[in-house]
Amino acid sequence: MCSKFKILFILIALLFVWSCADKEKKISKIVEADMEMQMSNAYKEGYLELQRGDVLLAAKKFNEAELLFPQSIWAAESAIMAAYAYYSQNYYSDAVYELERYFETYPNHKDNAYAHFLLGMCFYEQIVDEKKDLKSLLDSKKQFEIIINEFSSTEFAVDAKFKINLIDEILAAKEMYIARYYLDKTKWI
């Protein structure tokens, strides 16, 4: 009985050694042209998925394009498109995350005006009314002020000024809401 186990053990050991023996190995090289083609394909797939309405897959493809070739001109574009994909379907927190990552990675990119505008719009779209928290309101105003101060010659500056006027009206409504509350409670300041 014991010898049967020894023979079985030896056969298994030989099979293991034989399967691990050196065979001709195929080493695949990643050619830069292939990487650029993969990056381009990922960007195109992301764009098609965005048009179809599958924003999660689109954002994944845009992020994939950015990761495949981070030094290309398409990397920053892919990061913005991933954020836009989330924004287009009201995934504002995901869009904010993508845009903050974009600003860390590409602080001096030519599309920063649009990225600030998109970030401002993400915060702006989360404004409910004057009775709610002011954080998204103030964050939105901050982004629009950056556009006016740093990118005043872009087409986004006009819209940013308009949005700031609307935000100021909401802030004034908030002050009126607070004043009415204290008047109703007869809590004179």
Residue ranges and their predicted role:
Residues 1-8:
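Bacterial N-terminal signal peptides that target proteins for export
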Residues 9-17:
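Bacterial N-terminal signal peptides
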